[in-house]
Curated annotation (Swiss-Prot):
Residues 45-103 are annotated as: Disordered. It comes from the Bacteria. GO terms for cellular component: ribonucleoprotein complex; ribosome. One of its GO terms (biological process) is translation. Pfam families: Ribosomal_L4 (PF00573). This is Large ribosomal subunit protein uL4. The lineage of its organism: Bacteria, Bacillati, Actinomycetota, Actinomycetes, Mycobacteriales. The gene is rplD. PANTHER family: 50S RIBOSOMAL PROTEIN L4, LARGE RIBOSOMAL SUBUNIT PROTEIN UL4M.
Length: 219
């Protein structure tokens, strides 16, 4: 498989060279079950898991027998905090728990490659030199530039951590999500319609992704 070549767009509307997307990262077979498993694990890990209900032993009150055992014609009861009473404890209710699912690193990496490949095949990856011209942050300029690249609703912008100018320019835009290249993940790729990479962030991601593949092959 040959590498995919994309133009590098500039903020003034022109292009400045091209970049190659390695086929080993951006042109692989997509496994829907793998994507589902990895995304499910990601969303599960975000859950706090602090939900809790009180059992009959934790509800306040109910220490005294509500009425005598015999002679009333009613069913015997030992506490007004038993589960069948209003205000009583909960039976088998949710308790605090950890929702984390163990997902091997190779599965996460394979899912991310599959998600990126899907976006690349549908021309939904764009590469920019800088998000805004000059050294002054401008939300208006960032909105205009992204609007020229894509008219889709949700956009994921991948930037370098040191690119403070671009981060400040795009962070308040609605439906635009910003990530550093080292935090790129399957869920955010699939949750966005289009991806916009800065050249710096794209090169850093490719270097890390292809370097990890080389290490795996050498084992």
């Amino acid at each position: 498989m040959s590498n995919l070549t994309l133009d590098v767009h500039t903020a003034d509307g022109s292009t400045n060279g091209t970049v190659d997307l390695p086929s080993s990262v951006f042109d692989v077979e997509v496994s829907t079950p793998l994507l589902h498993q990895v995304v499910t694990a990601q969303l599960a890990a975000r859950r706090q898991g602090t939900h809790a209900t009180k059992t009959r032993g934790q509800v306040r009150g109910g220490g005294r027998k509500p009425y005598r055992q015999k002679g009333t014609g009613r069913a015997r009861q030992g506490s007004i905090r038993a589960p069948q009473f209003t205000g009583g404890g909960t039976v088998h209710g949710p308790q605090p728990r950890d929702y984390d699912q163990r997902t091997p690193k190779k599965m996460k990496a394979a899912a991310l490659r599959g998600a990126l490949s899907d976006r690349a095949r549908h021309d939904r990856i764009h590469v920019v030199e800088d998000l805004v011209p000059g050294q002054t942050p401008s939300t208006k300029a960032a909105r205009t530039f992204i609007g020229r690249l894509t008219d889709r609703k949700s956009v994921l912008v991948v930037l370098g951590r040191e690119d403070v100018n671009s981060i400040k320019s795009a962070r308040n835009l609605p439906n635009v999500h910003i990530l550093p290249s080292d935090q790129l993940n399957t869920y955010d790729v699939l949750n966005s319609d289009d991806l916009v990479f800065s050249v710096e962030a794209l090169n850093a991601f490719i270097e890390r992704a292809t370097g990890a593949e080389t290490k795996e092959e050498s084992k």
